[in-house]
Curated annotation (Swiss-Prot):
Family label: Belongs to the BRX family.
PANTHER family given in the database record: PROTEIN BREVIS RADIX-LIKE 1 (PTHR46058), PROTEIN BREVIS RADIX-LIKE 4 (PTHR46058:SF31)
Subcellular location: Nucleus
Gene Ontology, cellular component aspect: nucleus
Protein name (database record): Protein Brevis radix-like 4
Organism the protein comes from: Oryza sativa subsp. japonica
Keywords: Nucleus, Repeat
Domain BRX: 86-142, 274-329
Polar residues bias spans: 253-263
Low complexity bias locations: 222-236, 243-252
Predominant localisation class: nucleus
Region spans: Disordered: 12-37, 151-263
């Protein structure tokens, strides 16, 4: 009986000892990756890109001894290879985030993307901000200036995102600083958009039209809509009196100047269908479509809610419908 009791006590003591070891546990072996640490390179005012931080490695003790509750594990953060390019994001102002690429060898940074919050900037405000701040950003963040060709990439449009983007393949010395005076934007006209920086040019006129999606080319360029408008006006001038011809020239001039406020090119080729917006008067925006055969049609008429109530807009259209069709179609 005494021997049996001693055996039972030994077995129960062994079970308690193993239970304590299971409850205490042991850290994973050295070198095992247990988690990804996302803020290893965090700097004030900067939003870290997830792809820029490697996984963290657990460096706890071995599994032979029990770990105490007061022990603190050590973490070793792997650094990127020397000379390897790394992306990082800086929030320069509320609603403005810029993605940079650190160049190899510590040679500065390259500007990759500028992101604007759609809740704080429309496309005209974003263009104006970049025109006023591009030199400051280049100096502040040590952005290298390249003389290589800058090629635009296709614009991104995602209805699920509430942000707008400037995308730039490379940084240039000739970043545009001149911005046209845009027409006022109403909430229903704000859509997803992209603006791309062209290569530096020598003439001031080309610099004023660096943002092609935001302003059309000057009348002297090879824009098919401008050529079609001039060709349509020539036979009309030939069959009208001098006074009527003068009115037609004024109308063409008004169209050319007003269309610089905004241009919208459809998904089809420019040689097939072209659309542009004309500001007939403050608060009235007329969208005209030109087909491949040169015929024009009135696409839509939009009124600013700040200047026109619904009844006033209907009255304005009834009074000016014939004039609009004769002037722009």
């Amino acid at each position: 009986m005494i021997q049996l009791k001693d055996m039972v006590m030994k077995l129960s003591g062994t079970s308690r000892h193993h239970g304590q070891q299971r409850r205490g546990g042991s850290p994973p072996p050295r070198g095992r990756t247990t988690s990804v640490y996302r803020s290893g390179y965090y700097r004030p005012g900067m939003v870290q890109d997830d792809m820029a931080v490697p996984p963290a490695t657990y460096l706890g003790g071995g599994g032979t001894s029990m770990s105490s509750a007061s022990s603190t594990p050590a973490w070793d953060f792997a650094r990127p290879a020397e000379g390897e390019a790394r992306e990082w994001v800086a929030q320069v102002e509320p609603g403005v985030q810029i993605t940079f690429v650190s160049l190899a060898g510590g040679g500065g940074n390259d500007l990759k993307r500028i992101r604007f919050s759609r809740e704080m900037y429309d496309k005209w405000q974003a263009q104006k901000w970049w025109g006023e701040n591009n030199e400051r950003i280049m100096e502040l963040y040590n952005v290298r200036r390249f003389s290589r060709q800058v090629l635009p990439t296709p614009p991104r449009s995602d209805d699920g995102e509430r942000e707008s983007f400037y995308s730039q393949v490379g940084s240039t010395r000739g970043s545009p600083a001149a911005t046209p005076s845009p027409a006022p934007l109403t909430p229903d006209r704000v859509t997803s958009w992209s603006a791309f920086v062209r290569p530096p040019s020598a003439s001031r006129q080309q610099q004023q039209h660096s943002f092609r999606p935001l302003s059309p080319p000057p009348p002297s360029s090879s824009n098919p809509s401008e050529r079609a408008w001039q060709q349509q006006q020539q036979p009309q001038r030939a069959g009208k009196s001098p006074a009527a011809a003068s009115d037609a020239m004024d109308a063409a001039r008004t169209t050319s100047c007003s269309s610089r406020d905004e241009v919208s090119i459809s998904n089809a080729s420019e040689l097939e269908v072209t659309e542009w917006v004309i500001q007939d008067e403050p608060g009235v925006y007329i969208t005209v479509r030109e087909l491949a055969d040169g015929t024009r049609e009135l696409r839509r008429v939009r009124f600013s809610r700040e200047r026109f109530a619904e009844l006033n807009a209907k009255l304005w259209w009834e009074e000016n419908k014939e004039r609009i069709q004769a002037q722009y179609l």
